[in-house]
């Protein structure tokens, strides 16, 4: 009986990502740097609406609801960003505690770490 009650509940999904997971109005906090805007900038992207984002399609197709989208354009996993700049405030490590109470968490990252040449460090 308990299994059917749990499976009948709508799952809440949170996102921790970079520009590939962001969309204006669907991001918390609203001060996070954006890449996809509600009013499309054709020179920048061909994404016309939030329904074209990978995460929105998955959430919609499964009947889930968005809890928190804490994505940040240009974010790195580590605290080091482009040109060796301090990216602590936008780091995945900093933002990972700000995802609400979701049932599912999607993490999409490392793109900027790779492009910025961020040091990988050592496995310990």
Task: Explain the meaning of each model-derived region.
Residues 12-14, 23-123:
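Conserved SGNH/GDSL esterase-like catalytic core that processes O-acyl groups on lipids
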């Amino acid at each position: 009986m308990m299994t059917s009650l749990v499976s009948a509940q709508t799952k809440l999904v949170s996102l921790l990502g970079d520009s590939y997971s962001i969309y204006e109005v669907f991001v918390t906090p609203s001060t996070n740097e954006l890449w996809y805007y509600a009013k499309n900038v054709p020179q920048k992207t061909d994404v016309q609406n939030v329904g074209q984002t990978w995460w929105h399609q998955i959430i919609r197709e499964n009947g889930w609801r968005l809890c928190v989208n804490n994505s940040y354009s240009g974010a790195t996993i580590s605290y080091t960003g482009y040109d060796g700049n301090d990216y602590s405030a936008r780091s995945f490590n900093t933002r990972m505690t700000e995802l609400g109470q979701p049932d599912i968490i999607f993490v999409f990252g490392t793109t900027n770490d790779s492009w910025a040449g961020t040091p990988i460090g050592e496995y310990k």
